[in-house]
Amino acid sequence: MKHADLSQRQLRVGEQVRHALAHMLQRGILLDDALKDVVFSVSEVRMSPDLKIATCFVSFLNTVDDISRATLIKVLNKHSRFIRGEISSSLRQMKYMPELRFRLDNSFDNFSKIDALLRLPEVARDLHHHKPED
């Protein structure tokens, strides 16, 4: 689902959930030993149309391989009820507390791949060659 497909309400509530998650993470509540030394960011939260499901996209900033990232996503999903309870006080205005589902956000990895491609000598030469004159 693209941003254009989401209503203003879904976008607003998603941002509120993201802020509540960020606030909880800043307090340093450790959920699991697997998350002890992991630095991660909740980059986006997308709400379902009925606002009962929040899909939370997470980027890990200091993990190397995809296997450990997948494991960490499983750990977050395992503790989603606890996290939901922790953020509920920040979201008291909501009629229903959404179910949290954590997913890996690959946008930073995709950006890195595109950046690396654009830095290739062949691509840089082509881009420079087709540059319009001022």
UniProtKB/Swiss-Prot annotation:
Keyword entries, A-Z: Cytoplasm, Ribosome biogenesis
GO CC, any one term: cytosol
GO biological processes: maturation of SSU-rRNA
GO MF entries: ribosomal small subunit binding
Signal peptide (residue range): none
Annotated localization: Cytoplasm
Superkingdom of origin: Bacteria
A Pfam family this chain is assigned to: RBFA
Gene3D superfamilies registered for this protein in UniProt: 3.30.300.20
InterPro entries, alphabetized: KH_dom-like_a/b, RbfA, RbfA_dom_sf, Ribosome-bd_factorA_CS
NCBIfam families from the UniProt entry: PRK00521.2-5, rbfA
Self-association and partners: Monomer. Binds 30S ribosomal subunits, but not 50S ribosomal subunits or 70S ribosomes.
Family: Belongs to the RbfA family.
Annotated function: One of several proteins that assist in the late maturation steps of the functional core of the 30S ribosomal subunit. Associates with free 30S ribosomal subunits (but not with 30S subunits that are part of 70S ribosomes or polysomes). Required for efficient processing of 16S rRNA. May interact with the 5'-terminal helix region of 16S rRNA.
PANTHER family associated with the record: RIBOSOME-BINDING FACTOR A, CHLOROPLASTIC-RELATED (PTHR33515:SF1)
Designated name of the protein: Ribosome-binding factor A
Species the sequence originates in: Bartonella bacilliformis (strain ATCC 35685 / KC583 / Herrer 020/F12,63)
The organism's taxonomic lineage, starting at the top: Bacteria, Pseudomonadati, Pseudomonadota, Alphaproteobacteria, Hyphomicrobiales
Gene name per UniProt: rbfA
